[in-house]
UniProtKB/Swiss-Prot annotation:
Protein family (similarity comment): Belongs to the adenosylhomocysteinase family.
Function: May play a key role in the regulation of the intracellular concentration of adenosylhomocysteine.
Name under which the protein is recorded: Adenosylhomocysteinase
Organism: Bordetella petrii (strain ATCC BAA-461 / DSM 12804 / CCUG 43448)
This protein's pathway: Amino-acid biosynthesis; L-homocysteine biosynthesis; L-homocysteine from S-adenosyl-L-homocysteine: step 1/1
Lineage per the UniProt record: Bacteria, Pseudomonadati, Pseudomonadota, Betaproteobacteria, Burkholderiales
Length: 472
C-alpha cells in the first residue's frame, strides 16, 4: 500500500508502506548496536514511567530514531512523529514505524509546505486529546507552538518573513488560525516540557528563556557530555565523509578541505578529513577554538583567504551566511560545498537563485555561475550527512537517544522539580549512567574505586566523579 494515496483513512504520511519490512530488518540490526536504549527498555518496561505521556516528536526519521520511538512506546508513551529536516528521512524507517501504529509524518525530499504541515500533524491527536511533551531537534516544534500562540494575539509577528522558510511557516500558521483562532495556545497550554537534541535548538531555548518567552520547562540534552562529546564529535567524524563520498566519489587525500567552525562538530569533521590525508584548514571566530585548531596542526585562516584555494568546504558553526555568494564566486571550479550544521542558511543558498542549477542526482547539484564556473552543492545546503548519507552510526546515537529517553522520563515524572521557562541539563550521575550502559559493547572494563581512594579525592565510590564545571 502506498500511504500517500491512502491519507483519508490512515493517520500517517510516509512515502511507501511496502518498505516497512526492509525497515524492520534494519531496525533489528540497529538494536544490536544501541545498547543504551535496549538497557533502558529492560530497566523501565515493567514500571512504565512514560504511561500517560503523549510525545510530539520532531527529529530526523531514521532507523536509529525508529529504535528511540519504539523505546519510548515500550516505556508507556504514545508518540506522533515528524522529521526535523526535509531531506533526512529514511523512507523505509518511516514505513516500519508507521506499520506498528505509531503515526509518522515524514518523506525524504518533502517540500517546505509539507514539512510544516507534518509538524502541525504531530500536535493533532485523536479524540480531542493533545500532546503533553515535546521531543525536539532544532527547536521547530517548540517554535511552532510559541510563534503560533503569539500570532493569535498579534498578527503582525507574521508580517515580514525573512526567508523562504519563514514565508512558508507564516503561511501555514495563518491558514491554521483561519480554521481555529486558538489552535496554538490550546496546545501550548498542555505541554509539560521539551527535551532538545541539538546545539541550534538549545540556543533557541536559551534565547526564549532569557526573554521570558519559554512557556514550559526544557532539558538541554545536547550539553550532556555523553551527547555533545560523542554524537557531535565521533558521530560527525564518521558521517561527514560518508555523505561527501556517497555524493561525489571524490578522492579526499591531498585536497585542501576547509572546516568552518571548530566546536565539537567541527573537531570531528577536521579529524575525519585529516585521517583521509586532506590538508585541513579551519575558520574560527573564537580565539580558544582557533588556538586548539592550530595546536592540532591545522591552518587557521579566514574564509576570504580560503575560498580561492580549497577543494572542499564544510560549515559547522550554527551561524548563518558563513559562506556567502562572494565566497562561492571566488571558489575554484568544481569546489565541493556542504553543511553539517542544523539549518540550511550557514551557506547563503538563497543568493544563488540567479545561477543555473543542474541536478546531478538527488541532493547533489551543480551551481553554474554567470561566468561558467561551477561548484558542487550538496543537500542544497542542508545537513550533508543525512541528506547524502544515513547520518551517524547507531552506536553513537544510542548514547544521544539514551539521554533523550532519560530526559523525557525525568521531565515527565518529576515535572514539579523543573520550573516553567527555565532550561536545565541532566545531572552528572545520569550522564555517567549513559556512559556505563555503552562500555560492555566495546569490551571496556571500569576500574573500581576503593573507599580510601574515594575519600582521598573526595568523591563517592559510585560517582559522580567529576564536578559539573569539569571540561571533558
Amino acid at each position: 500500500m502506498n500511504a500517500v494515496s491512502d491519507q483519508a483513512v490512515a493517520d500517517y504520511h510516509v512515502a511507501d508502506m511496502s518498505l516497512a519490512a526492509w525497515g524492520r530488518r534494519e531496525l533489528a540490526i540497529a538494536e544490536t548496536e544501541m545498547p543504551g536504549l535496549m538497557a533502558i527498555r529492560e530497566e523501565f518496561a515493567a514500571s512504565q514511567p512514560l504511561k500517560g505521556a503523549r510525545i510530539a516528536g520532531s527529529l530526523h526519521m531514521t532507523i536509529q530514531t525508529g529504535v528511540l520511538i519504539e523505546t519510548l512506546v515500550a516505556l508507556g508513551a504514545e508518540v506522533r512523529w515528524a522529521s526535523c529536516n526535509i531531506f533526512s528521512t529514511q523512507d523505509h524507517a518511516a514505513a516500519a514505524i508507521a506499520a506498528t501504529g505509531t503515526p509518522v509524518f515524514a518523506v525524504k525530499g518533502e517540500t517546505l509546505e509539507e514539512y510544516w504541515q507534518y509538524t502541525h500533524r504531530i500536535f493533532e491527536w485523536p479524540e480531542g486529546r493533545h500532546a503533553n511533551m515535546i521531543l525536539d531537534d532544532g527547536g521547530d516544534a517548540t517554535l511552532l507552538l510559541h510563534l503560533g500562540a503569539r500570532a493569535e494575539q498579534d498578527a503582525s509577528v507574521l508580517a515580514k518573513p525573512g526567508s523562504e522558510e519563514e514565508r512558508v511557516l507564516f503561511a501555514a500558521i495563518k491558514a491554521t488560525l483561519a480554521r481555529d483562532p486558538k489552535w496554538y495556545s490550546t496546545r501550548l497550554a498542555q505541554i509539560r516540557g521539551v527535551t532538545e537534541e541539538t546545539t541550534t535548538g538549545v540556543h533557541r531555548l536559551y534565547q526564549m528563556a532569557q526573554k521570558g518567552e519559554l512557556a514550559f520547562a526544557a532539558i538541554n540534552v545536547n550539553d550532556s557530555v555523553t551527547k555533545s562529546k560523542f554524537d557531535n564529535l565521533y558521530g560527525c567524524r564518521e558521517s561527514l565523509v560518508d555523505g561527501i563520498k556517497r555524493a561525489t566519489d571524490v578522492m579526499v587525500a591531498g585536497k585542501i578541505a576547509v572546516v568552518a567552525g571548530y566546536g565539537d562538530v567541527g573537531k570531528g569533521c577536521a579529524q575525519a578529513l585529516a585521517a583521509l590525508r586532506a590538508q585541513v584548514w579551519v575558520t574560527e571566530i573564537d580565539p580558544i577554538c582557533a588556538l586548539q585548531a592550530a595546536m592540532e596542526g591545522y591552518k587557521v585562516v579566514t574564509m576570504e583567504e580560503a575560498a580561492p584555494h580549497a577543494d572542499i568546504f564544510v560549515t559547522a558553526t550554527g551561524n548563518y551566511h558563513v559562506i556567502t555568494r562572494e565566497h562561492m564566486q571566488a571558489m575554484k571550479d568544481q569546489a565541493i560545498v556542504c553543511n553539517i550544521g542544523h539549518f540550511d542558511n550557514e551557506i547563503d543558498v538563497a543568493a544563488l537563485d540567479d545561477c543555473q542549477w543542474e541536478e546531478i542526482k538527488p541532493q547533489v547539484d551543480h551551481v553554474v555561475f554567470p561566468d561558467g564556473k561551477r561548484i558542487i552543492l550538496l543537500a542544497k545546503g542542508r545537513l550533508v550527512n543525512l541528506g547524502c548519507a544515513t547520518g551517524h552510526p547507531s552506536f553513537v546515537m544510542s548514547s544521544s537517544f539514551a539521554n533523550q529517553t532519560i530526559a523525557q522520563i525525568e521531565l515527565y515524572t518529576r515535572n514539579e522539580a523543573y520550573t516553567r521557562g527555565q532550561v536545565y541539563v541532566l545531572p552528572k550521575h545520569l550522564d555517567e549512567k549513559v556512559a556505563r550502559l555503552h562500555l560492555k559493547k566495546l569490551g571496556a572494563k571500569l576500574t573500581s574505586l576503593r573507599q580510601d581512594q574515594a575519600d582521598y579525592i573526595n568523591v563517592p565510590v559510585e560517582g559522580p566523579y567529576k564536578p559539573d564545571h569539569y571540561r571533558y
